[in-house]
């Protein structure tokens, strides 16, 4: 026991005699030099002691020196010089540089080593003391701080920047914060790739998004961050950096909820980041932001944009009718492979179809066909069908009709012919429609209808011939079916003939007309100028027995029936129809609600009208001006039992405006 205790006491007393405790007392082993320091002791672990390496010795000695600095900082003359009690004391450039370097060393050691004096952000007296000195220096001499900051080494700059940012934020030094961020970004831009890798850790900090930076600094942050990832494309981007990019690219005034993004501890590749940013730009209609991101990618020499980002960019330009920039992009050879995507095709066709400029559409398709695509016949048919649909959606019916006849005959197909018939129906070319359907569609349609007038029309001189389509080779699609029913109603314009045709189709086992076409025939009978009430009621009764076939068909029939009874003031049958409609009230629009209200108000059933109006408010239908004018006809006394239905402030404003 004495052999163990006496050497231990001797080492402890020798350690206490040292004025500066640069080396803490070793545990379980007394050594005479650092080279004899072992990591594992034989008596404790049962293993042979391993000699410490040179790196471990360097870390040990450096950590010990920082511990001595921490333990004696209050007695140091440098810190004594700038105590709060010493009025008028100002730090020099060398003093400030010394503090910064010492803080960065202690900060670095604390992240890798367990030191005796813990470097705690809230409890460490040294850090509290230094933060006070930094805040005092920011207040009294901010120019000196910025000068010293610009002279720091890269590693020291990376360590001291978050500390200075936190101190400046806590003391509300907004101007100093902005200038500090500017100096950091300028320093980052002037560094090489190795130095940028050291400084880049500060790009991930959340304090960027908590500082009110001007727009030029936000743009500079985005530019430098993207350029760094352009040159280091193998590195992914973490969620905090993507969140900062989102905040700086898009204004908070647009109602963004800047929630923190989470990628499940994954690094997001740059192409996915760009697709994410372009999708936000498309959603918020931010053309300038998308153009800025596109320029950054082009300047970095990264080649073509990622496909998803490019598609969103072209769709955004199409939405804003920026045809000039779209034309410049399509001429770049690097995007040729993207132009086969149907979303790109529809985006390019949208601004042209809105103007009805079918000649430009033809020239664009011709350029793609000969220089870009080399496409197959099936794909060309899809492109032309897209073009026809775009013209029809924008109600450019004459352009769509003319566009069809400019298509090469070998490209025409059933879909294109059907779209041409839709345009012809809107232009009231009903004789052409009947001839084309009778000639180029299979099934002897006109003979099966059994109307002599229709047969005579189709046997007359043909108004046109569709080259590229064989007679009798097409099948009647649902769209063509409705076009045929509409043309028959316009051409015959006879309620008796239409009623005979409707009865014939309803009694036929294999009816030519579908449900929607039957509704068109019914409306044709109801709207004929020389029709009688008996004929119309007979037509309504014919379809009333078939309404259980389909819910949508039932709603359409009851809607036509309701309109018919209200127009003829047959309120008894109107009430019966309304009872049937009340079971399906979630499935019809505001027009039917308005007819229901008209019928009730005309019968002075105001209490029922108020109940219907309450159901209208709870439904998905949107009230219009007709609804508001009908409600004003109801006496206000009937709204007492429904206080929530009284005219709100918005309704009063609308009524006063009307």
Curated annotation (Swiss-Prot):
Any one Gene Ontology BP term: mitochondrial gene expression
Originating organism: Schizosaccharomyces pombe (strain 972 / ATCC 24843) (Fission yeast)
Compartments where located: Mitochondrion
UniProt transit peptide range: 1-29
Protein name: Pentatricopeptide repeat-containing protein 7, mitochondrial
Deleted gene: phenotype: Impairs growth on galactose, leads to low viability on glucose containing G418, and leads to strongly sensitivity to antimycin A on glucose medium.
Signal peptide: none
Keyword list, A-Z: Mitochondrion, Repeat, Transit peptide
Per-repeat ranges for PPR: 130-164, 220-254
Known role: Mitochondrial RNA-binding protein required for the stability of the atp6 mRNA.
One cellular component (GO) term of this entry: mitochondrial matrix
């Amino acid at each position: 026991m004495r052999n163990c205790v006496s050497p231990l006491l001797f080492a402890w007393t020798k350690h206490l005699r040292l004025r500066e405790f640069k080396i803490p007392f070793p545990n379980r082993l007394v050594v005479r030099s650092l080279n004899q320091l072992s990591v594992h002791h034989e008596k404790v672990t049962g293993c042979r002691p391993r000699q410490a390496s040179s790196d471990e010795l360097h870390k040990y000695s450096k950590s010990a020196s920082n511990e001595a600095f921490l333990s004696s900082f209050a007695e140091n003359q440098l810190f004594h010089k700038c105590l709060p009690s010493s009025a008028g004391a100002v730090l020099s450039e060398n003093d400030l540089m010394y503090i910064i370097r010492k803080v960065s060393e202690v900060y670095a050691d604390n992240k890798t080593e367990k030191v005796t004096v813990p470097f705690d952000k809230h409890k460490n007296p040294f850090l509290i003391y230094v933060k006070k000195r930094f805040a005092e220096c920011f207040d009294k001499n901010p120019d000196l701080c910025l000068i010293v900051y610009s002279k720091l080494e890269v590693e020291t700059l990376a360590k001291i920047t978050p500390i200075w940012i936190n101190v400046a934020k806590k003391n509300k030094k907004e101007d100093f914060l902005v200038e500090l961020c500017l100096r950091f970004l300028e320093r980052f831009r002037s560094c090489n790739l190795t130095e940028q890798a050291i400084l880049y850790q500060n790009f991930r900090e959340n304090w960027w998004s908590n500082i009110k930076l001007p727009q030029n600094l936000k743009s500079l942050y985005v530019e430098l961050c993207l350029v760094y990832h352009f040159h280091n494309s193998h590195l992914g981007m973490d969620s905090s950096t993507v969140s900062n990019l989102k905040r700086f690219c898009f204004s908070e005034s647009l109602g963004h909820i800047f929630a923190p993004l989470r990628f499940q501890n994954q690094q997001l590749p740059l192409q996915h980041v760009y697709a994410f940013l372009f999708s936000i730009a498309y959603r918020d209609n931010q053309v300038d932001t998308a153009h800025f991101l596109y320029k950054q990618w082009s300047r970095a020499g990264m080649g073509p944009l990622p496909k998803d980002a490019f598609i969103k960019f072209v769709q955004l330009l199409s939405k804003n009718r920026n045809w000039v920039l779209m034309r410049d992009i399509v001429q770049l050879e690097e995007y040729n492979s993207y132009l086969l995507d149907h979303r790109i095709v529809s985006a390019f066709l949208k601004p042209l179809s809105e103007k009805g400029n079918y000649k430009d559409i033809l020239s664009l398709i011709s350029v793609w066909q000969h220089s870009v695509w080399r496409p197959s016949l099936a794909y060309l048919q899809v492109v032309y069908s897209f073009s026809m649909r775009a013209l029809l959606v924008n109600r450019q019916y004459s352009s769509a009709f003319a566009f069809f006849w400019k298509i090469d005959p070998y490209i025409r197909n059933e879909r294109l012919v059907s779209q041409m018939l839709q345009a012809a129906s809107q232009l009231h070319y009903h004789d052409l429609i009947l001839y084309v359907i009778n000639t180029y569609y299979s099934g002897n349609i006109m003979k099966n209808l059994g109307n002599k007038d229709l047969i005579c029309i189709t046997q007359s001189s043909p108004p046109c011939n569709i080259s590229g389509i064989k007679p009798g080779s097409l099948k009647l699609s649902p769209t063509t079916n409705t076009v045929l029913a509409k043309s028959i109603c316009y051409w015959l314009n006879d309620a008796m003939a239409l009623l005979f045709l409707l009865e014939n189709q309803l009694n036929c086992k294999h009816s030519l007309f579908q449900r929607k076409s039957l509704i068109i025939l019914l409306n044709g009978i109801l709207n004929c100028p020389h029709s009688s009430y008996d004929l119309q009621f007979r037509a309504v009764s014919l379809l009333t027995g078939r309404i259980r076939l389909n819910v949508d068909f039932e709603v359409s029939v009851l809607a036509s029936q309701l309109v018919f009874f209200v127009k003829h003031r047959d309120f008894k049958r109107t009430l019966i129809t309304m009872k049937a409609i009340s079971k399906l009230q979630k499935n019809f629009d505001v027009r039917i609600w308005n007819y229901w209200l008209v019928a009730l108000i005309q019968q002075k059933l105001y209490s029922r009208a108020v109940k219907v109006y309450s159901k209208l408010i709870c439904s998905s239908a949107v009230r219009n001006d007709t609804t508001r004018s009908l409600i004003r006809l109801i006496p206000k006394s009937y709204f007492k039992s429904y206080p929530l239905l009284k005219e709100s402030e918005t309704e009063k404003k609308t009524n006063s405006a009307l």
